[in-house]
UniProtKB/Swiss-Prot annotation:
HAMAP family: PdxT. One of its GO terms (biological process) is glutamine catabolic process. One of its GO terms (molecular function) is glutaminase activity. The active site is at C83 (nucleophile), H178 (charge relay system), E180 (charge relay system). PROSITE patterns: PDXT_SNO_1, PDXT_SNO_2. The gene is pdxT. It comes from Korarchaeum cryptofilum (strain OPF8). InterPro entries: Class_I_gatase-like, PdxT/SNO, PdxT/SNO_CS. One of its GO terms (cellular component) is glutaminase complex. The keyword Translocase does not apply. This is Pyridoxal 5'-phosphate synthase subunit PdxT. Keywords: Glutamine amidotransferase, Hydrolase, Lyase, Pyridoxal phosphate.
Length: 197
């Protein structure tokens, strides 16, 4: 089994380690590959879209990689997006300060995301968060977005003051926090429930 990590920016190594730890825990071997070009998507069983600065990631991909990624996910490739990854997966994105962003997105999930919802770096925080089907995890929110509205096929796995830190829709899981910094429980759930099914 091959799991890809979009490797343009963000906690790439931490996601790779969380996937390896999860596969050991589940009792199977996984090859983790870094995805930097459309051709790297071939033969994947799932993909992680890490956090980072969303407009920078889009520019680094030249859009071409993201469009190929979108096609793969629409064709059933299981995907997990954290922080900026959740922004890319949303059908609607706004910014806390400027409103409409016009930034490139994949537009896959029935949800509205507000970038930098909690403010700047100094407003970053950690908390224990209960995720349906996963349990309690230590959630790290770093310049985090917030999912403020869901509709259609999107379902919340948790709620936080009127926002949804974890949302699932079909083969996609979006998280506004960074699970890779504290636990592999979320990655394990992703592998078990979305990749192996």
């Amino acid at each position: 089994m091959r799991i890809g990590v979009l490797a343009l920016q963000g906690d790439i190594e931490e996601h790779e380690q969380a996937i390896r730890d999860s596969s050991r825990s589940l009792g199977f071997k996984v090859d983790v590959v870094r995805v930097k070009r459309p051709g790297d998507l071939k033969g994947l069983s799932g993909i992680l879209i890490p956090g980072g600065e969303s407009t920078t990631i889009w520019k680094l991909s030249q859009g071409e990689l993201m469009l190929a990624l979108r096609d793969e996910i629409l064709n059933g490739l299981p995907a997990m997006g954290t922080c900026a990854g959740a922004i890319f997966m949303a059908k609607e994105v706004k910014d806390r300060v400027v409103g409409e962003t016009g930034q490139g997105i994949l537009g896959l999930m029935d949800m509205t995301v507000i970038r930098n919802y909690y403010g700047r770096q100094r407003e970053s925080f950690e908390m224990d968060l209960n995720l349906e089907g996963i349990g309690s995890v230590r959630a790290v929110f770093i310049r985090a977005p917030a999912i403020v509205r869901i509709w259609g096929k999107a379902n919340a796995l948790s709620e936080l003051n009127g926002t949804y830190p974890a949302v699932i829709q079909d083969n996609m899981l979006a998280l506004t926090f960074h699970p890779e910094l504290t636990t592999s429980k979320v990655h394990e759930w992703f592998l078990r429930e979305l990749v192996l099914k």
